[in-house]
From Swiss-Prot:
<comment type="function">
    <text>Produces ATP from ADP in the presence of a proton gradient across the membrane. The alpha chain is a regulatory subunit.</text>
</comment>
<keyword id="KW-1003">Cell membrane</keyword>
<comment type="subunit">
    <text>F-type ATPases have 2 components, CF(1) - the catalytic core - and CF(0) - the membrane proton channel. CF(1) has five subunits: alpha(3), beta(3), gamma(1), delta(1), epsilon(1). CF(0) has three main subunits: a(1), b(2) and c(9-12). The alpha and beta chains form an alternating ring which encloses part of the gamma chain. CF(1) is attached to CF(0) by a central stalk formed by the gamma and epsilon chains, while a peripheral stalk is formed by the delta and b chains.</text>
</comment>
<keyword id="KW-0067">ATP-binding</keyword>
<keyword id="KW-0472">Membrane</keyword>
<comment type="similarity">
    <text>Belongs to the ATPase alpha/beta chains family.</text>
</comment>
<dbReference type="GO" id="GO:0043531">
    <property type="term" value="F:ADP binding"/>
</dbReference>
<dbReference type="InterPro" id="IPR000194">
    <property type="entry name" value="ATPase_F1/V1/A1_a/bsu_nucl-bd"/>
</dbReference>
<dbReference type="InterPro" id="IPR000793">
    <property type="entry name" value="ATP_synth_asu_C"/>
</dbReference>
<dbReference type="GO" id="GO:0046933">
    <property type="term" value="F:proton-transporting ATP synthase activity, rotational mechanism"/>
</dbReference>
<keyword id="KW-0547">Nucleotide-binding</keyword>
<dbReference type="GO" id="GO:0045259">
    <property type="term" value="C:proton-transporting ATP synthase complex"/>
</dbReference>
<dbReference type="GO" id="GO:0005886">
    <property type="term" value="C:plasma membrane"/>
</dbReference>
<dbReference type="Pfam" id="PF00306">
    <property type="entry name" value="ATP-synt_ab_C"/>
</dbReference>
<keyword id="KW-0066">ATP synthesis</keyword>
<keyword id="KW-0813">Transport</keyword>
<dbReference type="InterPro" id="IPR023366">
    <property type="entry name" value="ATP_synth_asu-like_sf"/>
</dbReference>
Amino acid sequence: MNLRPEEISSIIKEQIKRYENKLEVKDVGTVIQVGDGIARIHGLEKCMAGELLEFPNAVYGMAQNLEEDNVGCVLLGSDATIREGDIVKRTGRIVEVPVGEALLGRVVNALGQPIDGKGPINTDAYREVERVAPGIISRKSVHEPLQTGIKAIDSMIPIGRGQRELIIGDRQTGKTALAIDTIINQKNTDVICIYVAIGQKKSTVAQIKDSLEKAGAMEYTIIVSSTADELAPLQYLAPYAGCAMGEEFMEKGKHVLIIYDDLSKHAVAYRAMSLLLRRPPGREAYPGDVFYLHSRLLERAAKLSDERGGGSLTALPIIETQAGDVSAYIPTNVISITDGQIFLETELFNAGIRPAVNPGISVSRVGGNAQIKAMKKVAGTLRLELAQYRELAAFAQFGSDLDKETQERLSQGERILEILKQPQYDPMPVEKQIMMIYATTKKYLTDIAVEDIRDFESGFLRFMDNEHPEVGKDIVATGSISEETEAKLKEAIESFKKQFKAERE
């Protein structure tokens, strides 16, 4: 085949035109040490704190320690396939999770990947897990109630939208049950719920999902699960991921309730991670920044100003104490960060007082601002009467000859305690709570035997639904008890009481 010189030159010119020189510049590093879910990488000089790094075999890690000659990285997957000398690439991204309506009703892991077998999550929206909390100007004071449906809480330790209320107590005192009841009570309201399980057993998470499905609460709930068998970095990320999902709704003007169950296990996961990264240990071997770990998470709960859409993110963190020791490191930290705490006691739980709330040391620093007027009016004396009852009950053990006034106070206290008991998965609407607390504080139940109080309560609320539904509707509509409504309520209580007593005779 003969080619003329001019043909050769035209072919070469054509080839030169088509030639594309693609240069891809990537900041890469080399693994110098790996083990226990931690990798040390040489290179990556421009790496950011918290940046996502890509290892071979699609394993990702998160940069934590930026040192002079290496980067300490925690792995978000198995380290079994990673070897010394492997190339690590920067992604230029901070860890993100999917957000939006598509997540409702789903169970996801700490990276927002579905783990419920219902297929992929169809959303294009992503948010960084670490965000700066809203500033002072962006916020508004907490003033709307978030009804938990639990009489002891809504009456004495009210929670407002945008508040951070700690649930604290020993193991097996009903902390999770309290949180789940609060989620169930948000049905038919405009509140979206997120339950973050940190270091829990898989069976526990499955049981919670089952309970929420039975109550019809899963349709407005997201479960973020990082179970006990998962890597410490994933347990560390889970609450921030859940918070990012909640912030997406909050910034669209919606109301969100998020439960962190529990932050004790979160701190333990962070301690394990920090010690493996060779960070110096402090009190109880926790790293020095364990306060910041929780404060930067809980500060993201807020009630936004009207200019920012008026949305809210209410946080209910849970802390597990050891033998009721509230003065340990993590409990004191979280108590000082939150706007109040609900303290659950083993003694009360074992005595059959459930929910086992101790009103003496439980407090809501938002207080009456988070209550409707009607509840404020009827429940004002409740805490005082209970405190007097506890004091007198202690003295009454030593002597039997008590004066009439003391006997009356003891009798009233017993009835209040009985009224505040409530079965699990049975939250009560606020108007029914108000009617029942009104009947108790106005001493209509003094001549009803303590063992009959629960029957009286269920019968009375049925009677109000059937015979006087307008009383409840009026309380809900106005948020207060008018003189007319109060007169109707008094009449209804007396009428039902006669009927109840007649049935018992």
